[in-house]
Amino acid sequence: MKQSKLLMPTLREVPADAEVKSHQLLLKAGFIRPVSAGTFSYLPMAKRVLNKIEQIIREEMDRIDANEMLVPEILPAELWQKSGRYTTYGPNLYKFKNRQDRDFILGPTHEETFTQLMADDIKSYKKLPLVVYQIQPKFRDENRPRFGLLRTREFIMKDAYSFSADQAGLDTAFRNMESAYTNVFDRIGLNYRAIVGDAGAMGGSDSKEFSAPAAAGEDIIAYSDTTDYAANLEMAKDFYERQKPTFSAEPLEKIDTPNEKTIEELSQLLDVPAEKLAKTIMFMADGELVAVVTTGDFEVNDVKVQNFLQADTLELAEEGQVKALIGASFGSLGPVKLPENVRLLVDERAADLVNFAAGANEDGKHYLNINWQRDVQLTEENIGDFRTAREGDVAVDGHGHLVFTKGIEIGHIFKLGTRYSKAMGAQVLDENGRQVDMIMGSYGIGVSRLLSAIVEQKADDDGLVWPASVAPFDVHIVPVNTKDDEQAGVASQLEELLTKQGLEVLIDDRKERAGVKFADADLIGLPIRITVGKKASEDVVEVKVRASNTNIEMRVSEVVDSVSVLLNGDK
């Protein structure tokens, strides 16, 4: 393709509102343009990359016998009301009415739609297992879109769903999809980790997240420095063995703490380390007030709390609400003498505290020498891991220490079980003639997000660097002087030879200075650049490998074989 015919409006300056490298370079190189906050147009170069990513996905889905199809992006509210997510999904769900005053949504994901389809059309276990998928835009009304394609209101996603008659079928589908995702990301050329993830609004019993380490990542990944353990910080666990301390219980004592509102202040007053103190955080979980107690040196992990409670919604309680019920403000809360309608959860580290201090549920008062069972009844069913892991802690497997890094979520796979099939009535007759709920899995890849993830990992100071497997073109031919007949002839000859080999070629036929052409070539980052310059008369050109920035002079007759080898080495 001739570059003069390509819509690729490059910029010389980086837009001021572009915060991260991928946003800056995709704008500067003419790959994307903003339409509104969180929505973008994908220009021809970006669309070519997306097409190649999608083709890799399709090939890997074909390997596991997944069926590609397409369902509507506009969905009737009744579908989501059946599952309960119409109210629990939260403010990120786009809702609207049509002219007949019927409620609709723009789909952020499609569990309900596919499950209803299966409920209507699949009645026997003999038709299972089935895996279906689609690649289409999704919509999420993000409060604050940012970082270019990393957090948007409209995004392209591949979402897949498996339907099985039993747990073994789900386990097989999950393993197959995990293998397929590994192949996809390997072929794209990304550095990534498969980590323990949170199922979140999707629900389900098990999930695994694929994360690409990058400075622009909004997720924090915790991994062991000596083993394969890795998890999203929301799910990360540190190593802890429950203690059975031998101790002498001291008398419970209430003291005045008029100026001590934080763990740090209380620690200083009592000359006691934070890990020997307890702090209490109040949450509202599905309308129920829940008190969560951890040791003072840890933060409460709300995701772990929500998963433990299996709550649809969890948010920090409002201070006025807490004071009206308990009689104390934040900073003076504790586990002793809580009202009966407040559920108590205690982190396992806090459950092993003895003679510890905590708020007395009176403003300006704290208890000393609290002991479980004597002062607060505590059962094992209310003890768990409710803390956020810290960098440097021993990893949960007891080997190595946790290291934190930022990551971009690029894929996620879930074992949903029967959450949606029960709600949507998706049942089949099993081999014994009994009606059973289909057992489901849900699997997603952020297709448009992959554009940014690739750029974040691969780009250098000069611009984009596309892996050969997804590059918009394979080869960039740059004649230094288009008015020179010999250069133009060699460039045309190379274009023809390379195209016959099945390679996609972009030829810079613009009447621009050589420096401008070279800068643009580095900026758009095609894998191979062939510069046709003064040595064209000698049938010699310069081949540049963009990823390594190495230059090789070679004869025109050597170019086709050499370029093929160089490209295959990058795929």
Curated annotation (Swiss-Prot):
Domain of life: Bacteria
InterPro entries in alphabetical order: aa-tRNA-synt_IIb, aa-tRNA-synth_II, aa-tRNA-synth_II/BPL/LPL, Anticodon-bd, Anticodon-bd_dom_sf, Pro-tRNA-ligase_IIa, Pro-tRNA-synth_IIa_bac-type, Pro-tRNA-Synthase_IIa_type1
Assigned keywords, A-Z: Aminoacyl-tRNA synthetase, ATP-binding, Cytoplasm, Ligase, Nucleotide-binding, Protein biosynthesis
Annotated GO CC locations: cytosol
Catalytically driven reaction(s): tRNA(Pro) + L-proline + ATP = L-prolyl-tRNA(Pro) + AMP + diphosphate
EC number(s) reported in the record: 6.1.1.15
UniProt-annotated location(s): Cytoplasm
GO biological process: prolyl-tRNA aminoacylation
MF (Gene Ontology): aminoacyl-tRNA deacylase activity; ATP binding; catalytic activity, acting on a protein; proline-tRNA ligase activity; transferase activity
SUPFAM superfamilies reported for this sequence: Class II aaRS ABD-related, Class II aaRS and biotin synthetases, YbaK/ProRS associated domain
Family (UniProt): Belongs to the class-II aminoacyl-tRNA synthetase family. ProS type 1 subfamily.
Entry's free-text remark on domains: Consists of three domains: the N-terminal catalytic domain, the editing domain and the C-terminal anticodon-binding domain.
Assembly behavior: Homodimer.
Name by which UniProt lists this protein: Proline--tRNA ligase
Organism: Leuconostoc citreum (strain KM20)
